[in-house]
A protein has these predicted regions:
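Acidic, low-complexity/disordered tracts enriched in E/D and polar residues
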Residues: 2-68, 77-83, 143, 173, ...
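Intrinsically disordered, low-complexity terminal tails and inter-domain linkers enriched
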Residues: 63-79, 123-141, 284-303, 431-456, ...
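Long, charge-rich, low-complexity alpha-helical segments
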Residues: 81-146, 211, 524-582
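SAM-dependent Rossmann-like transferase core, predominantly class I methyltransferases
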Residues: 121-130, 136-205, 210-218, 222
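Conserved SAM/SAH cofactor-binding pocket of Class I
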Residues: 179, 187-271, 277
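Conserved Class I SAM-dependent methyltransferase catalytic core
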Residues: 231-232, 315-372
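Mobile active-site "lid"/loop adjacent to the S-adenosyl-L-methionine
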Residues: 273-322
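Flexible, glycine-/basic-rich loop-and-beta segments that form/coincide
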Residues: 379-438, 445-483
Length: 582
């Protein structure tokens, strides 16, 4: 059964200010809710198992609490406002009006109803939800949430972040499949994008496909002006609500991908686009048919329903191709774009064949492009992941038909694998100005060629990933301006987190394998021969790189010219990955 979807919350400044005051007073934070739940229940909830959390807060939903909130039988903390708010807005429980009134003294129950975040509960359904079997019954003084209102915590170099993010109620709270227009809260992909986005002071930031607005909120801490776009009017309503609740200024525009910002350039573009590859026929649909580019009339029988937060209404991975082909024109000189995405691998292609084809034009224009594949699934695994995400399990009668639809779609393009990862683009200050920006450019030097780097990395080390990737982009730019003679004349240092790992057969003197292992960043492991390992080990800034290579060759009787020619590209790679520093 699919959940009904209520109207989006209303943007009423006075009531939002009262709600904010109540949330602050209640200490409705991630840390506080985890204290209330305990380690076991909090951990289970992160795995999307709400049962331990419901047990921990069960006294709040006891029938005795409806007529007499003082009768709540449990620890004092369970009767506190943070517990009430969490049970109501995250677990989807029906709670006594009196308890809610105590938790929201400034806003009040009526104010919460006017905002569109609460409604009277009707008993008979799960957790007091409307029951078609008893439509005339009344709740006896209980209310339920119309939105998920979750605390959010993060930290950047400007300090601790504590926000609240409103979105549509999750499947966990409603017990029903998601509505096609569902607006997602802060999911795993949102957290990933927030972790990899550079956090540096900039002028203009664009969030493409903003959803409930979390990336725009993060960007506001470093930008003078943030613009967030989405095709979904409902998503923009939630984003506006969240910006106002958290006292953040964001300009919101409705439209598909980059259409709302035609002719404009930005210093930073972030996007968690609806990249999920879903059976949608063989060609892109006209976006005028509906918010996801499809309509009920042109959806084939057995074709999965579209969810606007994940489905872009395009065939295969063409939405990502479309977005990446258009992005460069919107990057100002020195500007960076960071996004997540999926790409298909067909037939005997290399995993990066599609990203390379999409980014060839950007590279030719002088941009630096970096694709990092973090995960890969076969077609069956991918289908299972996203059918489950839509609320269908293997026990559901629709499961075989849905899986078959995905596999048939992949077979039509001979897809053998699907990758997930990061795409980063940077327009160097010296690269040719974009068409949109050319009227403001005095004519920059576009002679420096662009670069295109792809790698598969699955690890994560210590440190801040956003800073690590930003440093890598700067190093790509720096090295592109440095010839081999300049590099050889540089004094390099090995990174403090770098170690060498040697594999030896028992009793052998010489290693069968040498690896350079990174402790920070993406925790890369790079195979090395004796010459590279010896060179890296000696790079402490005392000698130049060229002198160090010459010394290693003298000790090993290796040919200096051949060794240098072989090692310099490897050293460049180690500089980009942060294993070496200039």
């Amino acid at each position: 059964m699919r959940s009904d979807i209520p109207p989006a919350p209303r943007l009423l400044p006075d009531l939002l200010a009262a709600l904010r005051e109540d949330l602050l007073r209640a200490r409705y934070t991630v840390e506080r809710t985890e204290e209330l739940l305990g380690e076991v229940a909090a951990g289970a909830l992160r795995r999307e198992d709400p049962v331990p959390a419901r047990r921990a807060l069960a006294p709040l939903t006891d029938p005795a609490a409806v007529s007499d909130p003082a009768a709540v039988n449990g620890p004092a903390a369970v009767n506190g406002p943070a517990a009430v708010l969490f049970a109501l807005f995250t677990l989807g429980a029906s709670v006594s009006e009196q308890l809610v009134a105590q938790a929201l003294p400034s806003l009040g129950v009526e104010g919460a109803r006017e905002l569109g975040i609460l409604t009277p509960a009707v008993p008979g359904g799960r957790d007091g939800r409307d029951s078609p079997d008893d439509p005339d019954s009344t709740a006896g003084g209980t209310v339920r949430a119309l939105v998920d209102l979750a605390p959010y915590s993060a930290e950047d170099d400007r300090g601790q972040i504590s926000w609240w993010i409103a979105s549509d109620l999750s499947e966990l709270a409603t017990g029903a499949a998601l509505h096609p227009d569902h607006v997602l809260g802060v999911g795993g992909a949102s957290l990933t994008l927030a972790r990899i986005t550079p956090r540096e002071a900039v002028g203009r930031v664009l969030d493409v496909g903003c959803g409930s607005g979390i990336q725009a909120l993060h960007a506001s801490r470093y930008a003078e002006h943030v613009i967030a776009t989405d095709l979904s009017e409902r998503a923009l309503a939630f984003a506006a609500f969240n910006a106002a609740l958290n006292q953040v200024e964001v300009e919101l525009r409705q439209g598909s991908l980059l259409d709302p910002v035609a002719g404009e350039t930005f210093d930073l573009i972030v996007s968690n686009p609806p990249f999920v590859i879903t059976p949608r026929g063989t060609a892109p649909r006209d976006s005028s048919d509906g918010e996801d580019g499809t309509s009920d009339g042109d959806r084939d029988k057995g074709e999965p329903e579209a969810w606007t937060y994940r489905d872009g209404g395009r065939a295969g991975d063409t939405l990502l191709a479309e977005l990446l082909s258009a992005l460069p024109a919107h990057l100002a000189p020195g500007g960076t774009a960071v996004m997540l995405g999926n790409w298909e691998r067909s037939g005997d292609e290399q995993w990066d064949a599609h990203p390379r084809s999409w980014l060839a034009a950007a590279q030719a224009e002088g941009l630096d492009c970096w694709v990092i594949q973090r995960e890969s699934e076969d077609p069956a695994q991918y289908a299972e992941t996203w059918v489950r995400d839509g609320g269908i399990t293997s026990r559901d009668p629709a499961w075989p038909e849905m899986i078959d639809a995905w596999l048939t779609d992949f077979d039509s393009r001979d897809v053998r694998g699907i990758g997930f990862g990061y795409v980063l683009l940077r327009r160097p200050q010296s690269a040719g100005a974009s068409t949109a920006d050319s009227q403001h450019s005095s004519g920059t030097d576009s002679s420096r060629p662009g670069t295109l780097r792809t790698e598969q990395v699955t690890g994560t080390g210590s440190g801040t990933l956003s800073a690590h990737l930003a440093a890598g982009l700067r190093m790509i730019d720096h090295l592109a301006r440095m010839d081999d003679e300049q590099l050889a004349a540089s004094r390099l240092h090995r990174a403090s987190d770098l170690i060498e790992r040697r594999h030896l057969v028992p009793g052998a003197w010489d290693p069968s394998l040498i690896e350079l292992v990174q402790g920070a960043g993406l925790a890369r492991t790079v195979p090395a021969d004796q010459a590279l390992a010896a060179t890296v080990g000696a790079l402490d800034g005392t000698l130049t790189l060229g002198q160090t290579i010459a010394a290693v060759c003298a000790l090993t009787d290796a040919d200096p010219e051949q060794t240098r020619e072989r090692l310099l590209p490897q050293v460049r790679d180690l500089l980009i990955t942060g294993m070496l520093t200039l």
